[in-house]
A protein has these predicted regions:
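An N-cap/entry alpha-helix motif that binds or orients negatively charged groups
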Residues: 1-59
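Intrinsically disordered, low-complexity sequence elements enriched in Ser/Thr/Gly/Pro
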Residues: 5-10, 20, 139, 146, ...
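General helical structural elements
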Residues: 22, 70, 152, 156-158, ...
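Alpha/beta enzyme core
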Residues: 42-46, 51-137, 163-297, 302-354
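Intrinsic disorder/low-complexity segments
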Residues: 137-165
Length: 354
């Protein structure tokens, strides 16, 4: 049947009717709230490019986790800002690292909160890359790792033109550090391990290490399709993790490639991922949708810092209605097929949903 018998506006006449037939619903339990944890006590420093988001000390992280839990938010994910950085990413895998300390404190003080650990090395490496960096030598068989000068600046090696040709992120050597980091986080009480580095084989290496350490029931949420995106800028300020040279396009995905994203997801599933993630969310809704069509495991999506800051800028200038665009943006991600959404709006959205 068609018009005038069929009138789709009939079911749009009131809030109650619209709610009755709504196809996509948001719930606070589907949100994951990111926290940036730094050294100190009583620290709550707003991030300039992310209004309303803060670098916080462990004690403040406990209170944030408590509030998020009280609002029904599904979980939190921790990112660490270590006191010192080095080329072994020591702060990522030592048992007294900032994320490990925060995890123990939160699990001790906030009952039943789900804590997810981001496993990446960029925040902990002095050069800001997600793996071990080696400079390719002009003569065969002779290469040396990049070094930072004693004054904190780049050394002669690092100040040379940093291109994809001259520098290499060592994939297999990085896996050992990632695995150590995952086990250390699990020992601290982390509920879910979430590798975001985009090294080949990291899920399998982490799964093996967790199992050997006795953490057979600790699930892995893999950042399986993480794209080399321009939307990460504010996060890199928040986590002090911008690369000191070059970029991350040799390991993060090309944003033009949908089929390759499906291969990445498939490989991570075969290696033992229990859940997968697409990052960023908004520019890659088609990737989320295709992943939902092909795979039957839980799918997460990250509404990243650039998405958040872009909306916040328009909201603060009065160009967009705050409450509407928060929920509309999250609904689009959910409608595309994401079961979980990592978002800096988690607490705000939970309050709006009541």
């Amino acid at each position: 049947m068609s018009f005038p018998v069929t009138r789709l506006r009939r079911m749009r006449q009131s809030d109650s009717l619209r709610s009755l037939i709504r196809e996509t619903r948001l719930t606070p339990t589907s949100f994951i709230y990111p926290l940036f944890v730094c050294p100190g006590e009583g620290v709550r420093k707003e991030i300039g490019s992310m209004p309303g988001v803060f670098n916080i000390s462990v004690d403040e992280a406990v209170e944030e986790a408590r509030e998020a839990k009280s609002l029904g938010v599904g979980g939190i994910i921790l990112f660490g800002l270590p006191e010192k950085k080095d080329e072994a990413a020591t702060g990522a895998w030592i048992d007294d690292g900032i994320v490990q300390r925060a995890t123990r404190a939160i699990k001790r003080e906030v009952r039943d909160v789900v804590v997810i650990g981001d496993v990446c090395l960029c925040e902990y490496m002095s050069h800001g890359h997600c793996g071990i960096v080696q400079k390719k030598s002009s003569s065969a068989g002779n290469a040396s790792p990049s070094k930072r000068g004693s004054n904190g600046g780049r050394s002669a090696v690092a100040t040379q033109a940093a291109t994809e040709v001259e520098y290499e992120i060592l994939n297999d050597e990085t896996l050992e550090i990632l695995a150590k980091t995952a086990v250390s986080q699990a020992r601290a009480g982390m509920d879910i391990i979430a590798p975001s580095d985009m090294m080949d084989g990291r899920v399998g290496a982490i799964r093996k290490a967790l199992d050997q350490a006795g953490f057979l029931n600790t699930p892995i949420l893999s950042y399986a399709a993480k794209f080399a995106s321009g939307f990460y800028g504010p996060f890199r300020e928040a986590a002090d993790s911008a690369p000191q040279f070059g970029d991350r396009r040799s390991y993060q995905m090309d944003g033009a490639n949908l089929r390759e994203a499906m291969r990445e997801i498939s490989l991570d599933v075969k290696e033992g991922a229990d859940m997968i993630m697409v990052k960023p969310a908004m520019p890659y809704l088609d990737v989320i949708s295709e992943a939902r069509r092909r795979f039957d495991l839980p799918i997460a999506a990250y509404q990243v810092s650039g998405e958040y800051s872009m909306l916040q800028a328009a909201i603060r200038n009065g160009w967009l209605d705050r409450d509407r665009v928060i929920l509309e943006s999250l609904t689009s991600i959910r409608r595309a097929g994401a079961q979980l959404i990592l978002t800096y709006f988690a607490k705000d959205a939970a309050r709006l949903l009541g």
